[in-house]
């Protein structure tokens, strides 16, 4: 996605990358998509709220293809289903943090190994 490419090309300080991508983004995104959209705009049990929040979650990650959008919307759907089942925003935040932690760990590992792979 455009979002992922921007992160990869930014060569951001690892501390800032972790702070924003692993901690801040999941908290803000879950507050907006699950807490606000699913919890306040729609009823937490609303299928429409689940679908709208999932589709918008996919779009805000700036997908550059339908396949990438499906991946992000699918993640939004999984987080939305978890929110519907447990109605605990902190569970969604933790799942999102774990997901982003894995992605950032892989990115940092690849950046570290890049000079040795050539």
Describe each region flagged by the PLM.
Residues 1-25, 113-118:
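Juxtamembrane helix-loop-helix connectors linking adjacent transmembrane helices
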Residues 15-19, 47-52, 69-73, 90-94:
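Hydrophobic alpha-helical transmembrane segments
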Residues 16-25, 29, 52, 56, ...:
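Hydrophobic alpha-helical transmembrane segments of multipass integral membrane proteins
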Residues 25-27, 58, 93, 97:
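Hydrophobic transmembrane-helix microenvironments that flank and shape a buried ionizable site
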Residues 28-52, 81-91:
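Membrane-interface helix/loop boundary segments of multi-pass membrane proteins
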Residues 32, 50-60, 75-77:
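Hydrophobic, membrane-inserted alpha-helices
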Residues 59-67:
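Membrane-interface helix caps and helix-loop-helix hairpins in membrane proteins
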Residues 66-118:
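Functionally important transmembrane alpha-helices
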